[in-house]
């Protein structure tokens, strides 16, 4: 059912569930729903981990503390294996990226109509609850990683070293500078683009499949497809968060390597 109360066709149902709650227009359009849910999930991550840190004990830990410790050790192990260098920011960044993206992805397992229907009852016409299925969110996170790549590249190599890396690789000859510059610029830009679009594409496809199941099948038969897909989607949710974290660490490790 739409915001105006009319019964939607399957096509209208799908279109309605893929429409964001927005303000502004054109380039300045802001997807309010994606912003709200991403901030709330980020706050949930900070609150829960801080709560565990404050109440951490050297005795017998609780279930939540055990889970957090396992998660921290998992991320720390990946950082030690991938990142070659010393940097106190990388491990916390990796943990934040993994948990935050996982929580955003996890919203995809909530029944399609559950939160949007409740929002409609309160007068909110449109609501999408999976922030990582919004390309603006995923590309914003990837852009943040891109700026960190530039920052650490310049910090470690200096402006001259960074420019030299862009102009004298892979062909170390002045005549090849234009070709090198094009190749290295494309390589550099492709990192955040692929990082953001990979996460968006996988989560958008997953959300769309849930919506298609809900929009095209009778309510009593939806579980036949939605339950197996949800079980499989748990793997995708976790894997995409892991891939984003690992590639972030890899890119930052590469940024701090001085190729001379």
UniProtKB/Swiss-Prot annotation:
How does the record say this protein sits in the membrane? Answer: Multi-pass membrane protein
Judging by the UniProt lineage, the source's domain of life is Bacteria
What InterPro entries does UniProt report for this protein, alphabetically? ATP_syn_F0_a_bact/chloroplast, ATP_synth_F0_asu, ATP_synth_F0_asu_AS, F0_ATP_A_sf
Gene3D superfamilies named among the record's database cross-references: ATP synthase, F0 complex, subunit A
User: Which controlled-vocabulary keywords does the entry list?
Assistant: ATP synthesis, Cell inner membrane, Cell membrane, CF(0), Hydrogen ion transport, Ion transport, Membrane, Transmembrane, Transmembrane helix, Transport
List the GO biological process terms. proton motive force-driven plasma membrane ATP synthesis
Cell compartments where the protein resides: Cell inner membrane
List the molecular function annotations (GO) for this entry.
Answer: proton-transporting ATP synthase activity, rotational mechanism
What sections of the protein cross the membrane? 27-47, 90-110, 132-154, 208-228, 230-250
Entry keyword annotation includes Lyase: no
- GO CC terms, sorted: plasma membrane; proton-transporting ATP synthase complex
Describe its function: Key component of the proton channel; it plays a direct role in the translocation of protons across the membrane.
> What subunit structure does UniProt give?
F-type ATPases have 2 components, CF(1) - the catalytic core - and CF(0) - the membrane proton channel. CF(1) has five subunits: alpha(3), beta(3), gamma(1), delta(1), epsilon(1). CF(0) has three main subunits: a(1), b(2) and c(9-12). The alpha and beta chains form an alternating ring which encloses part of the gamma chain. CF(1) is attached to CF(0) by a central stalk formed by the gamma and epsilon chains, while a peripheral stalk is formed by the delta and b chains.
Question: Per its UniProt record, what HAMAP family does this chain match?
Answer: ATP_synth_a_bact
Give the family from UniProt. Answer: Belongs to the ATPase A chain family.
Q: What is this protein called?
A: ATP synthase subunit a
């Amino acid at each position: 059912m739409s915001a105006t109360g009319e019964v939607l066709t399957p096509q209208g149902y799908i279109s309605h569930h893929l429409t964001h709650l927005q303000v502004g227009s054109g380039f300045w359009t802001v997807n309010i729903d994606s912003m709200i849910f991403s901030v709330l999930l980020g706050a949930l991550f900070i609150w829960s981990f801080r709560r565990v840190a404050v109440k951490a004990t050297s005795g017998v830990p609780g279930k939540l503390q055990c889970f957090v410790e396992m998660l921290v050790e998992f991320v720390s192990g990946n950082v030690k294996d991938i990142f070659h260098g010393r940097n106190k920011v990388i491990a916390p960044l990796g943990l934040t990226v993994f948990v935050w993206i996982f929580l955003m992805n996890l919203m995809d397992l909530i029944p399609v109509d559950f939160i949007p229907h409740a929002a409609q009852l309160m007068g909110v016409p449109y609501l999408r609850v999976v922030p990582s299925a919004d390309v603006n969110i995923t590309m914003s996170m990837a852009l943040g990683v891109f700026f960190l790549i530039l920052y650490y590249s310049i910090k470690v190599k200096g402006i001259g070293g960074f420019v030299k890396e862009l102009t004298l690789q892979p062909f170390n000859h002045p005549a090849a500078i234009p070709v090198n510059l094009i190749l290295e610029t494309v390589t550099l830009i492709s990192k955040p683009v692929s990082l953001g679009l990979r996460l968006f594409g996988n989560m958008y496809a997953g959300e769309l499949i849930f919506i298609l199941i809900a929009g095209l099948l009778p309510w009593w038969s939806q579980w036949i497809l939605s339950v197996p897909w949800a079980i499989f989607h748990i793997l995708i949710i976790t894997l995409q968060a892991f891939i984003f974290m690992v590639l972030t660490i890899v890119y930052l490790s590469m940024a701090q390597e001085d190729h001379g």
